[in-house]
């Protein structure tokens, strides 16, 4: 990153400091406090920590102030861990909810980070201040970068769209949406700035004359449009009051080739009035502030307060100067290419708009007529616009209007005049704005390069909600609604449809964001019509007002879900629409006027005829406006006809805007949209303030959360199979075999080779889909792979170059040796006399032969020169011909290119027109058939309608025949009059259409006459060129075919003209027939209905004929355009050289033939021809003007043709939409009809059944009431049971909470053991804890839901039982009906009971509704939990992805480990080889030592031979003094011997150097071996120590865990004791056991997750080891580099030694020369001076050489030894030299040698100095670099060791944790076993209790039997007593027996009975009294 200076650092507003965010303290605080989000009125959401859970409510403590509050569980939202703070993409959030999204946006906004990704789109919050993040440096930062490589920015979105456009060849669009003031316009400008910088064409093109002109103009288009189209509003200081779609075209290489701007709905009413504290358009204030005095006088400008249209005067904008902005606008216009006249004309129009507002009218005293008391302002206005003042005043005050067929002057009222002036001002400004946009498009589209694709930038007016909103706000909000629907459809519907279309696994998710109902409310054409359709419909009706429009709207749409009546502003607003951004109240004031946009056509005509060409150009289409007379006629009968006088060309503002919006939507659907959601932070326009509720509302409306969710759950990235294989096959080189393979199979193989998690991708039919981030990961791996390949390629290239350089050096070295050897040989031979003789004699031997050869060569040379001159001539001729042919070829190529271009254009135009014609014909046929079908359906509906009306009429006649007849007659009279008026209006319309057709016919006849006149002029020209024609008749024959084509087209034109005339006459006849029919209608009122149908049918026929006529006219225009194009092409070819005459002759022939045809047809043309022959001279002069006008007409015809085609296509689209709506409405009506019929039947059945039931229920209601009370009792019991179950559930939940608390305690203990693992382990534990809580909560809710469902089922069963009882009662009621007929009072009581029962039923239904509401609430909770579960599943997928990545890293690490093992083995082999080489070098050193000894012996032998030779030489010199020549030869031989000695010495030194080098290498190897051994020993020792430490830690952990296990056992015992208290109910215990089982499963899952985490950490440890090994490998590589550098140093030393040897050799020669000079000085005194001078020079050289020798002492020592030896030899030689007669020759020779030696010495000195300095500096630099590398590697090695120690420590902790988890698992297993045992024991107890109960039941049954026996005995005794009594009465035998106890025993016939005395007495008395006299 470049170093930045200054106060404002851009990185502060782009990047997040992750070191601050990854703070362990905040992470621990978050984990400990269990932080969540709760709702807050002030902050939206506040952070709080959970303290206690109380059922459905939770006690929380606010983090900010510590206050406590009770919050419902459903209102709590989870908080993300602190590591997700300020995350760049909100799709990465773990907990996705509104609170987290708002908190993230708020944190980033307060940190200056305004851009945030939200899945696939970007969210930007308006900062309300300037940020330094839009400079060119920032653009370069984002250029060419992928989205995930840089922080969020609008530049990243632009870069992504630009790259997608280039790669996919797909058009892109960037949609900036949001409310007004959210920053859409500014972001649009930044997009254009980025694209203009990145895709600038001048950077890569040399043919651009003005660098970047197009880009500069593109950038300057915005300031111009903002000046004329933006204004200050309450919400925004630079609010766009129009919409624009900027289309930037690019060529195939990505350069900008042009641009185009489309605008939508300028708010022109702002030009005449503004709301409070708002301004009009900027240009007015800029002009009044920035214009100079001269300009002000020209434009007649005044002060701000002098203009009525500036409602609020001058309101400055903070931070902006209107004067400076005016200068910028003018500069932008100049850059855009506006001329000075154009700018001045525009400013005149702006000034005239202000002058319109100053025109004042006055009401006349006695009439309502308006008058203009002072026309000063009118004079100024007319001066500016080029009009006549009197005509303007007359047109305003008394305009001419059409009444019937005549025009009359109508006086205007003051209100009408004011309205007309305001309408003209608005229309003038709107036309100026349209012209400005057209002019900018013309400047931007001037290039001829064809755009391959485009990027569209949409900047539309933002959503606006004012207190009262008008028609402009409706259009703006309608547009934003459509854009939001496009976003929803693109993000949610199309995305999921593509999943289903590709056949991947996907469950369709309905996000509930369909805005189509609101859009239909606004734009639906019928059934029922929408707002715009009703507005258009009201515009067509006479006497329609805004009030009637609102009434009709309420009538048609009052029941719509998105339509409401205003509640707050009932008196002010008219209706309310519920948009996606909120409710908007609309006031329908002047909506009909705004929709029609009427103008004073008298003034418009004056403006069209203005003397100012610019103003006339603005008002050129005055025939399309709606006149004010038409609007004023709305209250009269002529309004309808006046409104339709323009041949159907008039379109309302709503229709035009709707159609343009439809086109925009179609364009956007054909592009790949990139959404930028702009958010407004506050309404005060304050920086640094964010209103949370406002932002939340915008996020909800924009579907941000849903977009993030589908991005996370879906597969947003997709790529086709072929592209995937082509792009990522580099990652799987051997996965796909050679040969053909299907794309899908290849992708599947690649995916398997990439080892991707199956959850991360889906394979469709034609594409492969990826989750978010996967494709970016593959891109990174691909980049890394390519980087590795490039690095390897570079290494191979460097190796190749190094080997090549080494081979070259080897060749140079061998060449140097050859040169040295040859030089040495030459030095030996050059003083040898025979050599001199040989060199002198040898050339002489070849002289004679050379002369002969020279003569032969001269002859050959002459021949060759002759041939050369001949060939050069031929070559010049050939070059000349070649050049000529090239020129001809270029000319032909140009001609061919021009012809091909013309042919291609013509062919393309023909094909396009033919396709359009075919398409339009098909559409026309389709529409005709559809119209026929619709007419048939309409006829059927009309018949049905008539039947219904007849039925209604019959009913009305039955009620009141007399009144009905009178009303019917009155109604028929009124309808007949209305229809007669309507038919009259239609007749007037048809008459106007007929007149229009006549005018067009005349226009076409005039154009044909003009064409014929032009042909005659061309004929005159052809007569003048008749002589030339004779010369060019050959060319004419080639062009006869084109002439025939011209004749055919002319004949077709004539046929079309005649056809048009015939159709016009037919139309006139049909109009006459219609008039006759209307007369008949007036006479025959009784048959009005049938005649109306006939007239409507004929009207449809007329419209068909009209369309056909229009089609014919368009075809004629197209043919004329084709003729004109052919004419232009011929004219262009005529302008070329030597072709003008031929073209004229061709035209002559064509004109002749056409003239002959015209002479044959009419005699009038003959007269015209003679007349034109007389005027030929004048026509020649006017030819150019006529051609220009002709071209203008052709252009106009083209434009009209294009507009006609567009209108036809729009009509077709409207017809299609209308037909589709009709079909939909028909289907809806049919379904409604069926539903109503079914409902009627059902209601009838229900009525009959209810009556029947009422009669049956009257009798038995009391009994039913008793049953109902029984049902109530059952319900109460069920409620008690439910409460009991709820209490049990609460108990179970408390137990679960206790278990969770214990689990939390265990997690905290584990966290204490894992404290050094810091953030990661704590996060994982917290996530698992949350998952456990969530799962337990889900289970609890599911149990509650199941209990409620059971309760509901029980109630349903009770209800069914009641129904059965009711049925039984009904059956009984039929039987007892006769009995209760007389009991009327009972019936009344039953009625009251029935009412009471109904009340009870209502109470029950209310309770049922409450239960349903509770169920709905549970369903909502379930959906919320389901969403959270989805988020957790996404996180789980993310964790799985991480695990798979770690597994991949493990595999890579294994591969690296294997490679390292191979490398270590290779190093071992190299070590063995090095040892072997060392041994070899030792042997070699020994052999070299022996060779050295042998060399020394040879040298001694040579010295001995030398001494012998010297002795011989002395003898010879002493014997013969006259043989000086022999002395010289002997000296030569001595020198040769000395040279041999020197060579032997050098060889000896080289051998010594090699020996030393081998010894050094041996020492280095030994040192390396010792270091490696020490390293291995240290590694082994550290591993042993680590293992021992791990063992000790594990033992310690085991002990600690045993203690914890004991504690757990105690706690478990306490838990079992508490459980025993809860063992009253077996079901409660089973629920607890089930919960414990589930908890065990969760714990086991957690254990598995922790084991997986342990594996992950082991993988990380192994990765750390791998990194350590890599560091070691790098250190070894650096050692290798060091060795190579040492080898280079040795090589340099060798080169230094060789240079030193060369220097010694030179010094030796110098010494020899010095000795010879000294020896010769004894004989010749004359040479002493020269000798002294040479000695001084030699001494100087010796000093310099001694300075050079100071760096290498060893070499100097050797050099001194050798010099001493040489000196001794020289002294001996000098003593032997006694002869002086050769001194002169010797002196001369010495002088020559001295000169040569001087030159050599100078060269050697320079070379040696430079070489020594260069080598020394290079070596010093290398040594310094190596030392730095060594230090760096030492630091890295220390860091790696530290990292290894840290990871090993972490590994120990992980092992401890694993052991803890294992112990926990064992504990849980033991607990589960105990629980199972306890459950078995309880089951046994239950069985025993059941047995006891059975025993008790048996005893009870036994007692019951005994009791029954006793009762039976008692009954028997009572019977006996009764028999006894009877017998006593009869006087039977009775015997008594007394006992001691006073009791007596009574014996009666064998039976005995004990009685007391009293009893006996009483009994006997009774018996005696009742005893009769005995008969026996």
Curated annotation (Swiss-Prot):
- What do the Gene Ontology cellular component annotations say? cytoplasm; lamellipodium; myosin filament; myosin II complex
Phosphothreonine modified-residue sites: 1960
SUPFAM superfamilies the UniProt entry points to: Myosin rod fragments (SSF90257), Myosin S1 fragment, N-terminal domain (SSF50084), P-loop containing nucleoside triphosphate hydrolases (SSF52540)
Q: Residue positions of the PTM Omega-N-methylarginine?
A: 18, 1930, 1940
**What residue stretches are annotated with the IQ domain?**
786-815
Q: Where are residues bearing Phosphoserine located in the sequence?
A: 1145, 1935, 1937-1939, 1952, 1956, 1975
For the keyword Transmembrane helix, the answer is no
Give the UniProt record's GO annotations in the biological process aspect: actomyosin structure organization; cell adhesion; mitotic cytokinesis; regulation of cell shape
Name the residue ranges with Polar residues bias: 1967-1976
Q: Which residues carry this modification: N6-acetyllysine?
A: 442, 1241, 1301, 1645
InterPro entries (alphabetical): IQ_motif_EF-hand-BS, Kinesin_motor_dom_sf, Myosin_head_motor_dom-like, Myosin_N, Myosin_S1_N, Myosin_tail, P-loop_NTPase
Q: What functional role does this protein have?
A: Cellular myosin that appears to play a role in cytokinesis, cell shape, and specialized functions such as secretion and capping. Involved with LARP6 in the stabilization of type I collagen mRNAs for CO1A1 and CO1A2. During cell spreading, plays an important role in cytoskeleton reorganization, focal contacts formation (in the central part but not the margins of spreading cells), and lamellipodial extension; this function is mechanically antagonized by MYH9.
Tell me the protein's name.
Answer: Myosin-10
Q: Which organism is it from?
A: Bos taurus
- Please spell out the taxonomic lineage of the organism that makes this protein: Eukaryota, Metazoa, Chordata, Craniata, Vertebrata
